[in-house]
Amino acid sequence: MPGDLELAAVAALRRALPDARVHRGSPDWLMRPGRVECGPRWDLVQSVYRALAQRDLCETMPPRERRQVDAVIEREGEPPRIFEFDESQHFNAHRAVTLRLYPDDVETAFPLETWLSESETSTKKLGRTGGWGKAKPPLFPEPGGRHVQRAFRDALADLLPAVHGWAPTLRVADFEVQGWIHSPQGGALMGNLLEGRLK
């Protein structure tokens, strides 16, 4: 279930983009992306998975590999766009591994260097048991697999939109909004934050 901050961020996004349809859901190509869905970025996705898991990615994703993005943004005359609200668990050493592998031609709708810096300097302890750190077979069966799975899924959401004619995934971090996300000015401040990210 979405957390309080995520719900507030999506609500502020709707106020910031009154002409857009902002809704829950995930594009079909992101549900279980294998070789076909990754298209020309299959080798890149393979290299990301290999760096995280030290083995090759199967060409067809297992049926249990499903996911939900935080929101999809649709505006008339523009390609659709994924919105993701990244809380502290999205910034860690595994995410840094993925971000370092992005080639220069990967367009992002978030400050890549900020995301990399936050991931490299995160002091968040990565538990290897319990809900946050449990194994996530079949792709990430080791203890702590949930953390690695999250980093891989974030990378897929960044790398695959261009393959399918979608705009770059828009990311907003909790540390960018915590001081004002629940305020009456949240929508306007979200709009200010997004200037330059929505091109």
Question: Where in this protein do the model-derived segments appear?
Answer:
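Short aromatic-enriched loop/helix-cap "lid" or pocket-rim segments at secondary-structure transitions
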Residues: 35-36, 94-98, 183-184
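Conserved aromatic-histidine-acidic binding/catalytic patches
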Residues: 1, 59, 63, 145-149
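Nuclease catalytic cores
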Residues: 1-21, 150
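Active-site metal-binding core of divalent-cation-utilizing nuclease and nuclease-like domains
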Residues: 20-85
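Catalytic cores of nucleic-acid endonucleases
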Residues: 88-179
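Conserved glycosyltransferase catalytic-site signature
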Residues: 6-7, 66, 154-155
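Short low-complexity, flexible loop/linker segments enriched in glycine and/or proline
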Residues: 37-39, 184-192
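Acidic, His- and aromatic-enriched active-site or binding-groove loops in soluble protein domains
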Residues: 192-199
